[in-house]
């Protein structure tokens, strides 16, 4: 039986991918840089600066920091799509807390964003650990975030389970040696093929019977 449950944030507990993708799309349009859906998907589940570094050469005369600040400004505009709670998220968190299962979130977002989003969700006070982009030197798909969470909760990776919606996050969990449940909330099943189990969303979780016994 798993001793701790670790969750990604965006796309796993809250669905802000429409908002995030529109912010990145506005950046590309504003600078006249061609893009398609695969480009926008490449930002999902990764720290903004690391993902932007893959494309900064197309934005002549601009730094990664400048471009990420511009994206953040777009994301804060009132006309952007609103973030919504993923189905089953709060119900599962409350269930696990009542069962005394330690909970953690490992996100590619900065701490101020994560704490604000989790407070709005009503989940921040339920967590035993929160690992953000500010707490690691390498973001997903590097396993550092999930390994750090396991260390903070004093468990071995084999004693944890991760819930993720993005390929980068699934790779991070697997590289950390953790059983990973992929949620098809933002990507299709083919994109999440590295996950150990695939579910539609968190309403399909039947704790603790997930994966091998």
Swiss-Prot record:
Q: What residues bind a divalent metal cation, as annotated?
A: 8, 10, 165
Residue numbers annotated as active site: 8, 10
Q: Which domain of life is it from?
A: Bacteria
Question: Per its UniProt record, what InterPro entries does this chain match?
Answer: HAD-like_sf (IPR036412), HAD-like_SPP (IPR051806), HAD-SF_hydro_IA (IPR006439), HAD_2 (IPR041492), HAD_sf (IPR023214), PGP-like_dom2 (IPR023198)
Signal peptide location in the record?
A: none
Query: What top-level class of enzyme does the UniProt entry assign?
Result: hydrolase
Q: Name one GO molecular function term.
A: sugar-phosphatase activity
The answer, when asked if Hydrolase is one of the entry's keywords, is yes
Task: Provide the cofactor list for this protein.
Answer: Mg(2+); Mn(2+); Co(2+)
> Which E.C. number(s) belong to this protein?
3.1.3.101
Question: In which residues is substrate bound?
Answer: 8-10, 107-108, 140
Q: Which UniProt keywords apply?
A: Antibiotic biosynthesis, Cobalt, Hydrolase, Magnesium, Manganese, Metal-binding
**Mind telling me which NCBIfam families this protein's record contains?**
HAD-SF-IA-v3 (TIGR01509)
Q: What does this protein do?
A: Involved in the biosynthesis of the antifungal agent validamycin A. Catalyzes the dephosphorylation of validoxylamine A 7'-phosphate to yield validoxylamine A. VldH is also able to convert trehalose 6-phosphate to trehalose.
Q: Which family does it belong to?
A: Belongs to the HAD-like hydrolase superfamily. CbbY/CbbZ/Gph/YieH family.
- The name on file for this protein is Validoxylamine A 7'-phosphate phosphatase
The species this protein was found in: Streptomyces hygroscopicus subsp. limoneus
Q: What is the lineage of its organism?
A: Bacteria, Bacillati, Actinomycetota, Actinomycetes, Kitasatosporales
